[in-house]
Amino acid sequence: MKIIKPTPIKRVGKHDRERRVLLGLVDYYIQTGKPVGSNTLKEAGFEDLSSATIRNYFAQLEEEGYLLQSHSSGGRIPTDLAYRIYAHAYLNTNEPYPKQNPFEAFKSFESKEIAIFLQEAAEKLSWETNCAVFLSAPRFDHDFIANLKLVPLDAYRCLCIIMTDFGVIKTEVMHLPVKLSSFGIKRIENYFHCRLTNLGEPENLEPEEETVAQTFYNELMLRYIVGYSNFIDVDLYRTGFSRLLFYSDFQDTNLLASSLSLFENAHSMRLLLKECKALNHLRFWIGDDLSSFANSSPRCSVLTIPYYINYKPVGAVGLLGPTRLPYRALFSLLKLFSDCISETVTKNVYKFKIDYRQPEQSLYLKKEESLLIGQSRFLIEDKRP
């Protein structure tokens, strides 16, 4: 692996040389994962400093809390404090983008199914970074239920899957008043299709199946409308946590568990992304920085960046990985990712005339939601005598 040599600096003070040694050590450790000795660092681009001088800097940096020594004769490894100094040093630098844009294909996407696009984009980012990815999105309006599917869980419960025109998927667990056969489930799904499309009439339904179908249809419509109207949290997409298993840093199950607890906490994920969107710039949290977002002290790092619709921040995307991350490369990749999805989402929002909105605390229906309830596709059927 090629070691990035530091730029020679003339007439620098002791503090500047100490900082240069620290950044060089962190850079080398990120690339190799091995403790760094004075001779090793000297050969990695610090030929202008003697090994004794480097050891003196190591001792000073260790005393200041930036380095740890694994054992008396071993090299040093960076602490979370050192990672923060390193990440901050390169946060706003203009690192070159990859020669081949891994997100170039995003620009050819043309569809109103923006939710599907954002999920696929998150998957691609996870693949490129080997990190877990979480992404927030506004609510895209003028969306309608396109399909309803049923999956029996047991004799008394059924999982109802709601799919919309924009690719959003919601699930609801419903109680079954009667036991249904697989054929009965299919007939009820056909009933849903007929009601949603207003094409034809449902056929071959048994009386008890029709009762269940009508009840489920009415209940699912109301649940969807209430959830659609009472938009108090951004939509959150998460993927790629299994990729963290490939990091040697997470071979310790306790470290992995603390990171998993953070990743599975949707509220914490939303808070991190909300802060990034509000600040409107690339942001990072390392180690104890995340303590306020978790019950324990996660031994991991989170990097976030906002994305835009017509230059207005509407959401953010985050990476979760170990503290030993290639921050310089990931900062550059995140900026490129944000640029690409911002361009693609903006283009499709305008092309398909899609409105969007941010979460609100109000529980009252707006005029648009009142009109939505009146749409013919959402008419609730009541066949009671």
From Swiss-Prot:
Pfam families from the UniProt entry: HrcA
Annotated GO MF terms: DNA binding
Alphabetical list of InterPro entries matching this protein: GAF-like_dom_sf, HrcA, HrcA_C, WH-like_DNA-bd_sf, WH_DNA-bd_sf
Domain of life where this protein originates: Bacteria
Keywords for the protein's UniProt record, in alphabetical order: Repressor, Stress response, Transcription, Transcription regulation
Coiled coil: none
GO biological process: negative regulation of DNA-templated transcription
SUPFAM superfamilies registered for this protein in UniProt: GAF domain-like (SSF55781), Winged helix' DNA-binding domain (SSF46785)
Annotated family: Belongs to the HrcA family.
Function field: Negative regulator of class I heat shock genes (grpE-dnaK-dnaJ and groELS operons). Prevents heat-shock induction of these operons.
Protein name from the UniProt record: Heat-inducible transcription repressor HrcA
